[in-house]
């Protein structure tokens, strides 16, 4: 198992490129100093949550993986996909390509997902070993606790790939504006939460 790395992929939805310079984000700043950063990024089109998150998971553009918008009509299925429709979100027929958790499982690695787009549906008949149906009422701290519990499992049960999604600061920035005090407070809160996750990861067993 030592040659199989542990990867935790975290998304802060709609975290604007300059939020870390506008607001106090010491955890993200430290991660950037000690890790790798990008100077620019071109999102997939359309710049919506579901198409872009599934593009991250598959490496494919929306016209190749099938999620072309947050809501759309699929003529081949004669169905309307909506992000709030649990039956559609969990219908694997909408999801093309191969998300990274499917690749991981094919390679004998366990995977886990806390709300990543596509994880609620069987893709190629495969889902993460551990996953949660989306529920925005679950506190962010509880999500981190669950991820840390997954990574504390015995080695033969422990996921090597974990995807973790937070719907903020998207919701608050749409409600109050990207430069509002409310968005700033959310950005700083998320940074603190990442600090909790980072500290927890450092304490995990080998």
Question: What function would you assign to each model-found segment?
Answer:
Residues 15, 167, 200:
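Catalytic metal-binding/acid-base residues of hydrolase active sites
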Residues 9, 27, 189-206:
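Metal-dependent active-site segment of extracytoplasmic phospho-/sulfohydrolases and closely related
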Residues 3-8, 33-38, 106-112, 156-162, ...:
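Loop/turn elements at helix/coil->beta-strand transitions in domains of secreted/extracellular proteins
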Residues 61-189:
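His/Asp/Glu-rich, glycine-adjacent segments
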Residues 2-21, 25:
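N-terminal module-boundary/linker segments of secreted carbohydrate-active enzymes
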Residues 18-65:
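Short, structured active-site-proximal loop/turn typified by the sulfatase FGly-forming signature C/S-X-P-X-R
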